[in-house]
């Protein structure tokens, strides 16, 4: 017995010093987090994504992958103050000047995180990015982010675009589980050399499994639909060209114009949620102050309406489940106040947007999205407009270069409105251009910019004597006269009794695909592949001697 005891004591004596000399981070493995549901917003109007809790906030999976017009920049109301991020549900604080790693096991995507998320206006955060960059990242996470001094920072990892793309393709009702590792240490290790927080002599390492279920997918559809609205001095609207779903309407004592402004699809797994609110907001503060709450109203069905008044009136997620559109009503007084404030020739996407607020997540629950359709609002007295005859903001064409190939043709409708016909109407084409042999050509380029190919271009219209007039346009930014076009005239009478007229004509912009010069680049080299270009067509009108 004494021998055995002595041996045990010797073994203990040999082992104990080795154990006493070994130090490590303190590892805590938390119990699995309760599964959480999220709502994913796929914004095709603005080309970005947003994810927000369908129920409880923690563990967090919340925020947008891009800044919106609600981004806080240091003054005014604080709305969107960080981009999207995750955590393990404990919202653990970080120590100043310590280093922080976050990595995922069983990650749904490669390279899921970009760095340490922070609130952009807090001291030590980046106002532009809401991100503290790590020393390095890999397929699992990020490493060596130094916790800056100033405002509070937490164990939050900012989501990569790859993570959002994974959430986008998930079927509604499906789930994923991942293990979140979060580690902080006071040791100043070099993550670029492969060192990691979990291997240091001190620190805190937390491990937790989290599960998220996609409870809903809200897809905002960009219809590219376009319509013109002409308003007189009293704010009375007149619909011009276009295919947006608009009609004159009277709501209570207010007359005006209502239009379907948002198209969406909403798939759910049966989620019930009332913390998600959606409502429009006027972007121009002067106009917002000048109009009354009922001068702008919104509806899910075009018949029952709510006034626009900051966050006071909204539709909830549950209410949106029974619809697929949002309508907006503009009263004549709304338009009249625009006239009084000198707001004209404006696109509705610059006039107002829709806001998305999830009251469950105050730091990252704000989001903004543009309308699906666009209204071009112009004064009826002395204005000119040009829109695609397809009633879309960005018409496009594609084709092949070679003998017998068809031209790329774009049709447009030009409208003038005034007390009389315009004395002069001019048109021009702008875009990448180069003069070759004394003639201007539109220049199309390959994605890498190495191939630049010249294309001729023309503007043509029917004149009042029935002939076709054609200009060599070449993207040269030079005005051409189209006053002698064949105009279709519609008289109008203002509410004051003043008379005027609206004149319309059509014009075609054409890019031939069969010109031999387009078989070679501007450097006279052969080329093969794809080239592209974009440009603009501008019009202007002049009225003289108007009393």
Swiss-Prot record:
Residues 1-20 form the signal peptide. Disruption phenotype: Mutants do not express ECP and are defective in biofilm formation. It comes from the Bacteria. The keyword Heme does not apply. Induction: Negatively regulated by H-NS. Positively regulated by IHF and EcpR. Keywords: Fimbrium, Signal. One of its GO terms (cellular component) is pilus. It is found in: Fimbrium. Belongs to the EcpD/MatE family. Forms polymers. Interacts with EcpA. Part of the ecpRABCDE operon, which encodes the E.coli common pilus (ECP). ECP is found in both commensal and pathogenic strains and plays a dual role in early-stage biofilm development and host cell recognition. Tip pilus adhesin, which is required for assembly of EcpA into fibers. This is Fimbria adhesin EcpD. The lineage of its organism: Bacteria, Pseudomonadati, Pseudomonadota, Gammaproteobacteria, Enterobacterales.
């Amino acid at each position: 017995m004494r021998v055995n005891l002595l041996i045990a004591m010797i073994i203990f004596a040999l082992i104990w010093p080795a154990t006493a000399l070994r130090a490590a981070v303190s590892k805590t493995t938390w119990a699995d987090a309760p599964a959480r549901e999220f709502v994913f917003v796929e914004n095709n109007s603005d080309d970005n994504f947003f994810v927000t809790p369908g129920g409880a906030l923690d563990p967090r999976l919340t925020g947008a992958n891009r800044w919106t017009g609600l981004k806080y920049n240091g003054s005014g109301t604080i709305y969107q103050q960080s981009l999207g991020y995750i955590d393990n549900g404990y919202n653990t604080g970080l120590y100043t000047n310590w280093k922080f790693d976050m990595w995922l096991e069983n990650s749904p995507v490669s390279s899921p995180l970009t760095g340490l998320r922070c609130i952009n206006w807090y001291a030590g955060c980046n106002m532009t990015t809401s991100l503290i960059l790590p020393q390095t990242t890999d397929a699992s996470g990020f490493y060596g982010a130094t916790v800056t001094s100033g405002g509070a920072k937490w164990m939050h990892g900012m989501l990569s675009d790859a993570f959002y793309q994974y959430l986008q393709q998930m079927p509604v009702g499906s789930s994923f589980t991942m293990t979140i590792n979060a580690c902080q240490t006071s040791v100043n290790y070099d993550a670029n050399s492969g060192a990691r927080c979990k291997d240091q002599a001190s620190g805190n390492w937390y491990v937790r499994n989290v599960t998220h279920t996609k409870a809903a997918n809200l897809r905002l559809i960009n219809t590219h639909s376009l319509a013109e609205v002409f308003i007189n001095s009293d704010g009375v609207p007149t619909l011009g060209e276009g295919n947006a779903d608009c009609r004159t309407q009277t709501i209570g004592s207010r007359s005006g114009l209502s239009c379907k402004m948002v198209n969406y699809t909403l798939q759910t797994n049966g989620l019930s949620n009332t913390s998600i609110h959606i409502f429009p907001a006027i972007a121009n503060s002067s106009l917002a102050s000048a109009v009354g709450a009922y001068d702008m109203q919104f509806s899910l069905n075009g018949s029952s309406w709510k006034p626009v008044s900051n966050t006071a009136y909204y539709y909830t997620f549950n209410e949106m489940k029974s619809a697929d559109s949002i309508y907006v009503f503009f009263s004549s007084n709304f338009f009249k106040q625009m006239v009084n404030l000198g707001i004209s020739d404006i696109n509705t996407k610059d006039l107002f947007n829709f806001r998305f607020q999830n009251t469950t997540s105050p730091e990252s629950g704000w989001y903004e999205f543009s309308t699906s359709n666009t209204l071009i609002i112009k004064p009826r007295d002395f204005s000119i407009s040009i829109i695609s005859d397809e009633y879309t903001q960005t018409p496009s064409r594609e084709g092949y270069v070679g003998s017998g190939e068809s031209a790329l043709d774009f049709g447009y409708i030009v409208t003038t409105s005034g007390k009389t016909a315009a004395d002069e109407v001019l048109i021009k084409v702008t875009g990448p251009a180069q003069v070759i042999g004394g003639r201007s050509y539109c220049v199309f380029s390959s994605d890498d910019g190495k191939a630049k190919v010249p294309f001729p271009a023309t503007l043509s219209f029917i004149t009042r004597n029935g002939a076709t007039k054609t200009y060599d346009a070449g993207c040269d930014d030079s005005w051409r006269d189209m006053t002698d076009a064949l105009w279709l005239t519609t008289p109008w009478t203002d509410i004051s009794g003043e008379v005027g007229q609206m004149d319309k004509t059509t014009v075609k912009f054409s890019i031939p695909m069969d010109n031999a010069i387009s078989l070679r680049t501007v450097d006279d080299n052969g080329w093969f592949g794809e080239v592209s270009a974009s440009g603009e067509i501008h019009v202007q009108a002049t009225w003289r001697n108007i009393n």
